[in-house]
């Protein structure tokens, strides 16, 4: 299977590292993947139709922070050009989320790849949060797989759990602690750290961005919640329609007050069915100490799916590192390597011009 990677940040390099060391993992024995192209936004691109030497790619990146024009596989290609020009079986979308652009250009990358007959694995949650129904329909029409396990909770099999483990059950409600940065900062505030110190430490340790506003203002959790609601609840819930409260400007007295009431203050995302639609919100909530949500510390996360038939299902993730996130992509590649492509969905012709009508049966 030939893979084209769009983006080579922490997750992309984690994927490459796992592929380089795949012989160390018995469960990856069946994974036959050649990365034939890597495209970055500002650090160049590499293309080799026989497969790139990923060990050398990682070493060069570590030394140079990009792809030098002198590299024998260097190519002057952007993402869309690569999708159109580089023969591959799967496009792996690893570019950063652009919330202000409502998921673009990742949405266009995914759509173009599907239209050209490629399978798609995306770690970017934007295409799910803003365009999932259209992209899923495009994949079905083309008979291609669209996989996205890494978009929420890193490598935890959230979507595979719902797809294979909750067959026949309807998700009525979603609740989750979905943003690692804000949860770690809240834990630090509980210990008496100043907000600015807690944020600076999160940035030093690499789980907060240089511009942390999307995390602190609840946008990251809102985008993840919208992605979950679209996929698991069939909801037309865009991130902008999720009511939002972040932790910027949080009065530390709220944390102490929650503790005095036998609770912890957590930033929780919720989506629920109401009046034929799905509503969502992200906000600070006091959770009782006997609630599993109260046990979620530092960069860990948790998701609760409330269903009609399977009851309440809870999954947690404890302090993931970048290889856990990369594993979600590897898991999707394993799915592609073992699953036959779905049959293209035929569009039914509409009644009217060009549509064949049936003759009414003669009454007997």
Predicted regions and their residues:
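General beta-strand structural signal in soluble alpha/beta enzymes
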Residues: 90-93, 121-123, 146-150, 173-176, ...
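Substrate-binding/catalytic subdomain of NAD(P)-dependent oxidoreductase enzymes
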Residues: 188, 199-295, 300-302
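Hydrophobic beta-strand scaffold residues
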Residues: 120, 146-147, 209, 265
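Rossmann-fold NAD(P)-binding glycine/threonine-rich loop
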Residues: 96-116, 123-163
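Catalytic, metal-anchored helix/loop core of enzyme active sites in primary metabolism
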Residues: 173-175, 183, 189, 201, ...
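Rossmann-like NAD(P)H-binding beta-loop-alpha module
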Residues: 140-208, 219-220
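Conserved active-site and cofactor/substrate-binding residues in soluble primary-metabolism enzymes
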Residues: 6, 10, 14, 33, ...
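N-terminal glycine-/serine-/threonine-rich beta1-alpha1-beta2 phosphate-ribose binding loop
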Residues: 1-115
């Amino acid at each position: 299977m030939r893979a084209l990677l769009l983006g080579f940040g922490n997750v992309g390099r984690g994927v490459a590292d796992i592929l380089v060391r795949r012989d160390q993992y018995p469960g990856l024995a069946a994974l036959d993947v050649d990365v034939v192209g890597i495209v970055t936004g500002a650090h160049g691109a590499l293309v080799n139709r026989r497969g790139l030497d990923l060990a050398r790619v990682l070493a060069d990146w570590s030394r140079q922070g990009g792809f030098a024009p002198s590299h024998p596989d260097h190519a002057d290609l952007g993402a869309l050009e690569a999708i159109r020009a580089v023969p591959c079986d799967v496009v792996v979308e690893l570019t950063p989320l652009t919330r202000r652009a409502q998921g673009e250009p990742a949405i266009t990358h995914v759509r173009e790849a599907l239209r050209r007959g490629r399978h798609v694995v995306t770690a970017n949650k934007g295409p799910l949060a803003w365009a999932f129904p259209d992209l899923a329909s495009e994949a079905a029409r083309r008979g291609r797989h669209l996989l996205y396990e890494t978009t929420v909770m890193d490598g935890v099999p959230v979507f595979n759990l719902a797809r294979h483990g909750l067959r026949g059950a309807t998700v009525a409600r979603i609740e989750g602690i979905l943003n690692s940065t804000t949860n770690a900062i809240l834990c630090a505030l509980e210990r008496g750290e100043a907000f600015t110190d807690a944020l600076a430490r999160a940035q030093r340790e690499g789980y907060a961005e240089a511009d942390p506003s999307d995390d602190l203002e609840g946008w990251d959790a809102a985008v993840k919640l919208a992605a979950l609601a679209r996929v698991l609840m069939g909801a037309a819930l865009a991130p902008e329609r999720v009511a939002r409260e972040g932790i910027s400007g949080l009065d530390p007295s709220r944390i102490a007050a929650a503790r005095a009431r036998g609770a912890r203050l957590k930033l929780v995302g919720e989506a629920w069915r109401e009046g034929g639609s799905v509503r969502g919100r992200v906000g600070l909530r006091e959770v009782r100490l006997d609630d599993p949500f109260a046990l979620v510390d530092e960069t860990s996360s948790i998701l609760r799916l409330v269903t009609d038939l399977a009851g309440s299902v809870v999954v947690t993730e404890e302090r993931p590192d970048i290889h856990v996130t990369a594993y979600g992509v590897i898991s999707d590649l394993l799915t592609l390597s073992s699953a036959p492509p779905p049959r293209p969905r035929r569009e039914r012709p509409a009644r009217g011009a060009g549509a064949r009508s049936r003759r009414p049966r003669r009454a007997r």
